[in-house]
Amino acid sequence: MASREFTRRSLMQKGAAGAGFIALGSLAGCSGGDSGEDGTPTGTETPTGDGPGTSGGLNPGSIVPAQAGAVVSVDMQAMLDDDDLRDVVNTALGELAKFGEGGEFPQDVESAIEMAREEADLDPTGFNEGLLFMEVESSGTDEEYAGVVMETDWSEDELIGFLESDGDSELEQSEYGGKTIYSAPDSDDGGMAVLSDGRYVIGPTEVIEDVIDVSNGDGDAIAGELATLYSDTTDGHMAFATVVPDDALTEEDFSTDEITIESVGQIEYMSGSVYKTDSAYGVETSMWAGDAASDLADDIEFALDAAARMEDTSDELATRIEDVEVETSGQTTTMSYEEDIEEVKSYAEEYVGELIGMLMLFGMSSGTTTV
């Protein structure tokens, strides 16, 4: 029989699983639409551009260690307030439930929440904000140095109970920098630390200790262009910033017979966000290219214009390409695009329908195949 003792991997898997059903739970709006610090509902007004998480408390500049080269945030409160997003998820779940068998698949977000509560005995709507970070090396991201900081409404006992629910033994406790660390028995691989009431970090021991040092003011946090680009992203559902490794973006990778973006190799940092205004969903990507920022903007605008004029580009796609905005500010070039909310919902529902159709065809072909 396989052992069910805790390992760092099992802890990380439990944390990831929790984040998954928590994200779904946030869409249900069960906690009644929380507001930001100024009393304005988050995710429903025109973005301020002051940076993501202004409604929450996770600031990478005071939490994420300087060794990290990539940061990704998820603002669950923005999702919580987004009725349109919830409509799309309900449509998808409803269609998937029709495809499923046995009546065990949730019909909508609310029923998914109830199933999650029964399974984990933890309220998914208690997750407010998540911040994932990792080191970036020349070969790409380094999963050995990665962590997740969570801002929640859960008590320490509630979260520990969830993490221990699949194990045969209790997590062990230790202390570092005045903070409690929970880890697998007889393991030095890592675990989870309590940073403050409702705030936790999951990761390897080195990462946990670095986060505690930064939180206590005893360690260096991310700074410079990486931190600036992140803080300049538009408030929204998700945001990211990352170092771009040398040779990760090359002219050859972004060239065709008709289009060449020569300055793409000058990009050293990238950031972006997915956000919502009163009438549209939007995406933006910013690229720090130093003195080549203006050249990069020119290259991108030329490439977009050429793409819109290609013979195999439909009129609908050409119109959307033309709506992409390209701006340069100092050493940073930003691309952004916004789409009407109802159009986005229509596309999402159409995609769900196509996906269900593919699943049905696959199921039918599998059921009639003989060996």
Language model features with spans:
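Terminal disorder- and signal-encoded targeting elements
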Residues: M1-V371
